[in-house]
Amino acid sequence: MKLNTKHHGTIDYEEKDIINFKRGLPGFEHLKKFIVYSIEENNIFSVLQSLEEENIGIPVLSPFTICSDYEVKLTEEQIKNLKIKSEEEVWVLNTVTINSDYKEITTNLRAPIIINIKERIGEQIILKNEEYKIKYPIFQEENKC
């Protein structure tokens, strides 16, 4: 299947690539089906792309690329909702706010997107750990999360 994206042209994807968000995402509750694709020539950022609205693509990254000790503690209810059986089924992404000044590019460490890669379902959650910033600068000299 093909999808025309706003910023990255045509993306090929398969049915098995679709991630279902039962409740959508905050601000996009009406959107339920997404794919994640890598940005060419960039090994940090990916895009969480809506299949229902081609103009909606959210930059994301793995928090572990900038914060090796990042920790997500899911509640029993979240584990149940996402049908998680093991850590190996979990993919964690964080949204990114892009800025023309690279020093101002931030990620939201407080509200990760949790994806069960086996069941292809996802949910954005809010962590209780207030040490994780909502606007954490990605490109800083010291990465202390």
From Swiss-Prot:
Function (record text): Acts as an anti-CsrA protein, binds CsrA and prevents it from repressing translation of its target genes, one of which is flagellin. Binds to flagellin and participates in the assembly of the flagellum.
Domain of life: Bacteria
Similarity comment: Belongs to the FliW family.
Principal subcellular localisation of the protein: cytoplasm
GO cellular component terms, A-Z: cytoplasm
Record flagged with keyword Oxidoreductase: no
One Pfam family recorded for the sequence: FliW
Subcellular location: Cytoplasm
Organism from which the protein derives: Clostridium tetani (strain Massachusetts / E88)
Example of a GO biological process term: bacterial-type flagellum assembly
Protein name according to UniProt: Flagellar assembly factor FliW
